[in-house]
Design a protein with these regions (language model features):
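Amphipathic alpha-helical and helix-coil boundary elements used as assembly
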Residues: 1-313
C-alpha cells in the first residue's frame, strides 16, 4: 500500500515534501509526532513557528483527501523546529508536534484548591493556563466535592495526570486538519470504532508478505504479561475521628497491595477509587505490542485489541 503525506503550515511551502514521520500515541498518553520535511527554501523562519499549530495529513492517494477511512490527520503545536542539513538543492527541516496541553509540563506551581471536585480542579488548571476549553471534552463523573486538593511544587501536567490516574479516568485525542480535541472519560464505551473494517488481519513474524495489504493489517505481534496484585486495601486516619480510622478494600486473593495513608477523608472517597486502584495494580497485566499498516488503527482507541498496540510508520 502506497501512502502520501503532507505537512500543513502557513510558513512551509506547499510544494514541500514529507521525508519521514514518527508518531507515538495511545490511551492516556500525550501524542508525540516527529516530521521531517524537505523544501527548496533555506531560510524558513523557525523561531516564529514555535508554539504555532500545524497538521500532518497521511493517507492513500488513490482516495479523496476527505475520505476518513483512507486519510487521517495529526494536529498539534510545534514545540521543536530545526534545520537539519542540505539535501542537494533542497533543505531538510525537522518539526515536533505535541498536544496543546503538553505546555502544562513547563508550569510548576504550588497551590490549594478548596471545596471543589477533582474535575472542577482540572478545569480550573486548564483555564488558568489559557487552554481553549472548546478543545476539551469531559465525559466522566465529577466525583465528590473535596475539602482541599493540594498541588505542591508540581507541574500542572503531572498534577492533572496524577489525579486522572487516581480516579481511573483516561483520555485520548481526536484530530482534524485545523485542531485537536482532548477527550476525558471514565467510560469504556465512549470511543468510536476505527474507520473501515472492524477487524484487521494478523500476520505472524514469519509471514514473508510482511502483513502489508490495501486494507491494512497487524504484524509482528507479541504477547507480554507482568505480575501485580489481585487485592487492594487502604487505611487512613482523621484527627476529627481518631477512634474511627478510614478504610477501603477491593478484590480477592493473596497478592495484596496495602496503602497507608490512603489520603482520603471519608470511606466513600476511598471506596470511589477502589475499582481504578485495583485495576491499576492487577495481578496480571497483558499487552500485545505490534506494528500495523492500517492508517485508521491509530486514529483512536476503538479497535478490538484489549492491550496497547504501538503503531509506527
Amino acid at each position: 500500500m502506497t501512502l502520501a503525506a503532507y505537512f500543513l503550515h502557513d510558513s512551509v511551502p506547499i510544494e514541500a515534501l514529507v521525508r519521514s514521520i514518527r508518531l507515538r500515541e495511545g490511551l492516556s498518553e500525550l501524542f508525540d509526532c516527529w516530521v521531517e520535511v524537505v523544501c527548496e527554501d533555506p531560510d524558513l523562519d523557525l523561531a516564529s513557528m514555535i508554539w504555532s499549530t500545524a497538521a500532518v495529513q497521511l493517507g492513500d492517494p488513490g482516495f479523496p483527501a476527505t475520505d476518513p477511512e483512507h486519510w487521517r490527520y495529526v494536529h498539534g503545536a510545534i514545540e521543536e523546529a530545526r534545520y537539519v542539513a542540505p539535501l542537494g538543492d533542497w533543505h531538510r527541516y525537522s518539526f515536533r508536534l505535541r498536544p496543546s496541553v503538553h505546555g502544562l509540563a513547563y508550569r510548576v506551581r504550588t497551590r490549594i484548591f478548596q471545596q471543589k471536585t477533582v474535575i472542577d480542579v482540572i478545569r480550573q488548571v486548564l483555564e488558568d493556563a489559557g487552554i481553549d476549553m472548546d478543545s476539551i471534552v469531559f465525559d466522566c463523573d465529577p466525583g465528590p466535592e473535596r475539602d482541599y486538593v493540594t498541588q505542591w511544587k508540581e507541574s500542572e501536567l503531572h498534577f492533572m495526570e496524577r489525579w486522572l490516574q487516581e480516579l481511573g479516568i483516561h483520555y485520548w485525542f481526536e484530530h482534524t486538519e485545523v485542531d485537536h480535541t482532548m477527550h476525558i472519560s471514565d467510560k469504556a464505551g465512549t470511543h468510536d470504532p476505527i474507520e473501515g473494517a472492524p477487524e484487521l488481519e494478523v500476520h505472524s513474524r514469519d509471514d514473508s508478505a510482511g502483513g502489508v495489504s490495501d486494507q491494512g493489517s497487524i504484524h509482528h505481534v507479541s504477547y507480554t504479561t507482568h505480575f501485580g496484585h489481585d487485592r487492594w486495601a487502604s487505611r487512613d486516619w482523621q484527627f476529627k475521628t481518631p477512634n474511627e480510622p478510614r478504610q477501603a478494600e477491593e478484590g480477592e486473593g493473596g497478592q495484596e497491595l496495602y496503602e497507608y495513608p490512603g489520603f482520603y477523608e471519608t470511606d466513600e472517597m476511598g471506596g470511589g477509587s477502589r475499582p481504578s486502584v485495583c485495576r491499576r495494580s492487577s495481578r496480571v497485566r497483558p499487552s500485545w505490542p505490534g506494528a500495523s499498516t492500517a492508517v485508521g488503527c491509530c486514529r483512536d482507541a476503538g479497535s478490538r485489541w484489549s492491550g496497547s498496540i504501538p503503531t509506527r510508520w
